[in-house]
């Protein structure tokens, strides 16, 4: 009786350890801060970290406010991630942050809290409320067809650094 109980225990231990190994080997998608906006871009995790890196590197911070369940955000994200010019500028010339929640800085929502919303902050830590999209009722929103304007606004943010700082 003791012998069979011991054998049963060993069998249970073997099965459970093999199961644990199989679970560990299961492939999981990597967790990334890009959230689909561009996996080759270096993203910061928080607004405070973004401000620190913007000041340190003398690059503008681009803040993208979005939500996963927003169809407009998803459409913009898809085109943003496919646009090579935006991806290159974002990787090389900007500190990048995408947020799915609001920050405590009220300057990042001068005309309200809505998504998608893209704001620029220069290295002197000034929110550039003068860099706007094409909509008068949502100044900082962009739609997929607005990507040429977003490219122009990214270039404008870079020019303003050179001329003002």
Swiss-Prot record:
Knockout phenotype, as recorded, reads:
Knockout mice develop ciliated cells with normal-appearing cilia and histology. However, ciliary beat frequency was lower in airways from knockout mice compared with control mice in presence of calcium (20% lower in the absence of stimulation, 35% lower after ATP stimulation). Knockout mice show reduced mucociliary clearance. Knockout mice do not seem to show endoplasmic reticulum stress response.
Question: Is Cytoplasm among the key words of this record?
Answer: yes
Classify the source by domain of life.
Eukaryota
Q: Membrane-spanning regions, if any?
A: none
Protein localization:
Endoplasmic reticulum; Cytoplasm
Q: Name one Pfam family in it.
A: Thioredoxin_7
Query: Any signal peptide, and if so, which residues?
Result: 1-20
List the SUPFAM superfamilies: Thioredoxin-like
How would you summarize where this protein is expressed among tissues? Expressed in the ciliated cells of the airway epithelium. Not detected in the mucous cells.
Q: What Gene Ontology cellular component terms go with this record?
A: endoplasmic reticulum
| GO molecular function terms listed in the Swiss-Prot or TrEMBL record | dystroglycan binding
Report motif location: Prevents secretion from ER.
162-165
Listed A to Z, the keywords are: Cytoplasm, Endoplasmic reticulum, Signal
State the family it belongs to: Belongs to the AGR family.
Listed under subunit, the entry gives: Interacts with LYPD3 and DAG1 (alphaDAG1).
What role does this protein play? Required for calcium-mediated regulation of ciliary beat frequency and mucociliary clearance in the airway. Might be involved in the regulation of intracellular calcium in tracheal epithelial cells.
Under what name is this protein listed? Anterior gradient protein 3
């Amino acid at each position: 009786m003791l012998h069979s109980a011991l054998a049963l225990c060993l069998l249970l231990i073997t099965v459970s350890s093999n199961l644990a190994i199989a679970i560990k080997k299961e492939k999981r998608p990597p967790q990334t801060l890009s959230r689909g906006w561009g996996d080759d871009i270096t993203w910061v995790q928080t607004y405070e970290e973004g401000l620190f890196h913007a000041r340190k590197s003398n690059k503008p911070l681009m803040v993208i406010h979005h939500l996963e369940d927003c169809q407009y955000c998803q459409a913009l994200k898809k085109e943003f991630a496919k646009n090579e010019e935006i991806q290159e500028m974002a990787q090389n010339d900007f500190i990048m942050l995408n947020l799915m929640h609001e920050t405590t800085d009220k300057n990042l929502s001068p005309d309200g809290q809505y998504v998608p919303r893209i704001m620029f902050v220069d290295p002197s830590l000034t929110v550039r409320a003068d860099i706007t999209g094409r909509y008068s009722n949502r100044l900082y929103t962009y739609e997929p067809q607005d990507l040429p304007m977003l490219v122009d606004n990214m270039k404008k943010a870079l020019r303003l650094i050179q001329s003002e700082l």
